[in-house]
């Protein structure tokens, strides 16, 4: 069992080194029966202003647009259809950003509204544009307030929930810490709604099956993400080398306590070395378009020696994909090794599989590259959150 002093040291180290922070605020924190809870927003903005005084940069990922719209329109329950939800978001988004603007104006801080769909991050050019815009806003001392563009989004381009979006924004901005504020005190060792003796787990060093079992998917009446979705977000960011803390946004001074290194919430420590921004994009933003099956030698070269994938080690493939597409690399037992961007299309790879690189031009009449996947464009499975999309 990890001692209290060691946990305190870990928390202090994480807090002290967090110069750029993404703070995700859930609907259960921001909204009440009367709509957006201005008292909560004012309190959080007060705490965030103190973080700014400490020299930290802050990005907010804010839920609450749909919930705010529901209250403003006078609906008694969550809309059932997509058009109704999108209309509620259109009504509520203005109220939400206005609340942030007014709250931060007391501290002479400015905000900028950023609305995204997953399409904006899947496309590499748009991903870089979003990254550069966020970086510029932070350089100007402005606090970006990010949300999914619920008004126009469809299922095919949804992030799923703002927990997932916050993980992607933490990677996009190369943040030092992701803080997820919810109406729970952290990750419990059992469901606190059912077990009176349930206690918060102070620190998680590795998200394994036991930890996953602690998470009960119990979204609030207004939100879409429960503890399971927060755990998936934690897996994404910690796999990329970024710590995450889940804390109770309804508690006064929760951010002050977190950044003072106090034992509040659950701290998820990084599971590996920090990935480059591009590798984070490959690992957690893109959806694989096909599979490449490798022989034992190629699989070992990718997994253990950090080599690029050459055509000679390919024994099969599945799917239709073009140059630059993300594909999964599997060993000959169909186990996922990782994901990479291909320098050749599926049709081209089918023609050159199993042959040496010096024969590619003879077969195709041209050669894009010696490598089918360059090691700089490949991410091992261990650095990828193991969700259904990738495995």
Locate predicted features:
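C-terminal catalytic "cap/lid" subdomain
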Residues: 2-77, 82-110, 114-391
């Amino acid at each position: 069992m990890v001692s209290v002093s060691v946990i305190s040291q870990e928390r202090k180290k994480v807090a002290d080194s967090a110069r750029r922070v993404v703070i995700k605020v859930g609907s259960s924190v921001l909204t009440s029966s009367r709509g957006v809870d201005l008292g909560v927003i004012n309190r959080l903005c007060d705490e965030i202003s103190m973080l700014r005084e400490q020299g930290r940069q802050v990005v907010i990922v804010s839920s609450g647009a749909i919930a705010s719209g529901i209250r403003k329109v006078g609906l008694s329950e969550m809309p059932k259809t997509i058009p109704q939800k999108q209309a509620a978001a259109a009504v509520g988004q203005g109220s939400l950003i206005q609340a942030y603007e007014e709250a931060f104006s007391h501290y002479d801080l400015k905000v900028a509204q950023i609305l995204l769909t997953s399409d904006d991050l899947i496309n590499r050019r748009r991903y870089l544009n979003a990254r550069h815009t966020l970086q510029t806003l932070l350089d100007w001392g402005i606090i970006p307030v990010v949300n999914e563009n619920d008004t126009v989004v469809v299922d095919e381009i949804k992030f799923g929930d703002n927990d997932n979006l916050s993980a992607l924004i933490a990677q996009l901005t190369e943040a030092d810490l992701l803080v997820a504020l919810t109406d729970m005190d952290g990750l419990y060792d059992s469901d606190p709604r059912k077990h009176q003796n349930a206690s918060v787990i102070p620190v998680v060093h590795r998200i394994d099956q036991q930890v996953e079992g602690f998470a009960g998917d119990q979204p609030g009446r207004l939100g879409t993400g429960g503890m399971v979705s927060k755990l998936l977000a934690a897996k994404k960011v910690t796999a990329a080398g970024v710590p995450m803390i889940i804390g109770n946004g309804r508690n006064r001074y929760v951010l002050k306590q977190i950044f003072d290194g106090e034992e509040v919430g659950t701290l998820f420590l990084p599971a590996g070395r920090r990935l480059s921004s591009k590798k984070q994009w490959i690992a957690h933003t893109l959806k694989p378009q096909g599979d490449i099956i490798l022989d034992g030698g190629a699989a070992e070269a990718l997994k253990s020696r950090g080599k690029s994938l050459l055509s000679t080690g390919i024994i099969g493939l599945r799917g239709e994909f073009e140059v630059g597409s993300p594909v999964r690399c599997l060993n000959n037992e169909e186990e996922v090794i990782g994901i990479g961007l291909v320098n050749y299309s599926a049709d081209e790879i089918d023609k050159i599989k199993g042959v040496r690189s010096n024969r590619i031009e003879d077969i195709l009449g041209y050669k894009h590259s010696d490598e089918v996947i360059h090691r700089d464009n490949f991410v091992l499975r261990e650095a990828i959150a193991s969700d259904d999309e990738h495995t």
